[in-house]
Amino acid sequence: MGFDSVKVMENWQSKTSNENEKKKKKRRRKKNNNVRNSEHYEEEANGCWVKFRYIVCCASSTSDVETSLTLSTSTVGSQSAIVQSNDQPVGPVSSTTTTSNAESSLSTPIISEELNIYSHLKKFSFIDLKLATRNFRPESLLGEGGFGCVFKGWVEENGTAPVKPGTGLTVAVKTLNPDGLQGHKEWLAEINYLGNLLHPNLVKLVGYCIEDDQRLLVYEFMPRGSLENHLFRRSLPLPWSIRMKIALGAAKGLSFLHEEALKPVIYRDFKTSNILLDGEYNAKLSDFGLAKDAPDEGKTHVSTRVMGTYGYAAPEYVMTGHLTSKSDVYSFGVVLLEMLTGRRSMDKNRPNGEHNLVEWARPHLLDKRRFYRLLDPRLEGHFSVKGAQKVTQLAAQCLSRDSKIRPKMSEVVEVLKPLPHLKDMASASYYFQTMQAERLKAGSGSGSGRGFGSRNGQPVFRTLSSPHGQAGSSPYRHQIPSPKPKGATT
């Protein structure tokens, strides 16, 4: 073999060796890519676990959550600014409605600068809360809200570790739905307000969890759920004395926020679904995601985007965006009216002219001869006549169109204090017989029965529903019967 032939052979062997080496590298790269793809798939699968949970538990959250949308101040003054129905957020027609979550996601929050850590709050790990709620299983689901799903769980009384169901401390774990209508900003507000504000009529925040994109809040468990459930979902009505006890407790909670807290707070989202009840029907305010600091001394109001629930928001706040403590007083008046009548603040299932509770009730509030037409027919006379008169007068003051005329919440508390203990039941008086006769006469004359009818001689309470076919959402949906009115039988 000549020199040239040897050189060609060496070149061919070198080329073959290089090609083989390239093939080996290509195979190694392909193998590594497969490994990375497998790892990525596993990460996706793990990440989807939480998403799957939200899909299972919160599939209907878009339609029936009770949350708060924002109203652009450019639409203030427009009479058509609000067209939403009961328990639907205040929002504009002509401008773009954005969620508070959008506001929260505009920039990545710096947790260390925004989150105020309070020594009495417990920091839970996500895995502990996952185990405490039994893997967020559907049987532990208490309900849904704008923030996300709420689950029942059990943890150590003096720690954060999960314990066997029925032992330790019973808690309600609220999870942040990444696709929900409330976001990180509201999560922070909950911690920063409830972590600092301690009062018997505010729900107790036990702790929180923040890991990666997980945001959870842990509250004391409220066994009797929300006032909304008892007013609009139960087969048995709340007795009059219990209604007055709840009204007094809720008033004390607002009074504390407005007049007793070191830094006064405007609640901004007072409604029946945010009033939770413990085992003794003590009222506790929950959901501080929309709360705002009251105006500084020397200022009359806080200017802010309009946020809240339609039917509860004060008219001057909706029109101007000027927020004061008297805005909360108006909302309290709406809830007081709901407790008095057994009707929702907004209900399009009612006859024309009765959709808006406040507007329907105004003519009756200050008329001593007509106020009884407001009373929940399911009470069947088991209410205090003097108490009912006081409540209607108080509701009228709270619902005054002039915010300056509305009372302070401390004044509301003083009016309500004696009402749970009054014993002058209407059913035991001649007054009640006259009232019933007038009511039946008015009902037969109008054809609508003022929103109530009878079946087998007994009053029938109309079943209410939201525009989406449900009666509105609440963070608690327990099947706990309401107490019976005195003298009632099953």
From Swiss-Prot:
The modification Phosphoserine is found at S273, S303. One of its GO terms (biological process) is pattern recognition receptor signaling pathway. Residues 1-39, 80-103, 442-490 are annotated as: Disordered. It is an enzyme of class 2 (transferase). The active site is at D269. ATP binds at L142, G143, E144, G145, G146, F147, G148, C149, V150, K174. It is found in: Cell membrane. Residues 94-103 have a biased composition (Low complexity). The keyword rRNA processing does not apply. Keywords: ATP-binding, Cell membrane, Coiled coil, Kinase, Lipoprotein, Membrane, Nucleotide-binding, Phosphoprotein, Plant defense, Serine/threonine-protein kinase, Transferase. Residues 444-454 have a biased composition (Gly residues). Transmembrane segments: none annotated. It catalyses: L-seryl-[protein] + ATP = O-phospho-L-seryl-[protein] + ADP + H(+); L-threonyl-[protein] + ATP = O-phospho-L-threonyl-[protein] + ADP + H(+). Residues 136-422 form the Protein kinase domain. It is a lipid-anchor. Interacts with SD129. Involved in chitin-triggered immune signaling and is required for reactive oxygen species (ROS) production. Acts downstream of SD129 in defense signaling triggered by the pathogen-associated molecular pattern (PAMP) 3-OH-C10:0, a medium-chain 3-hydroxy fatty acid. This is Serine/threonine-protein kinase PBL35. It comes from Arabidopsis thaliana.
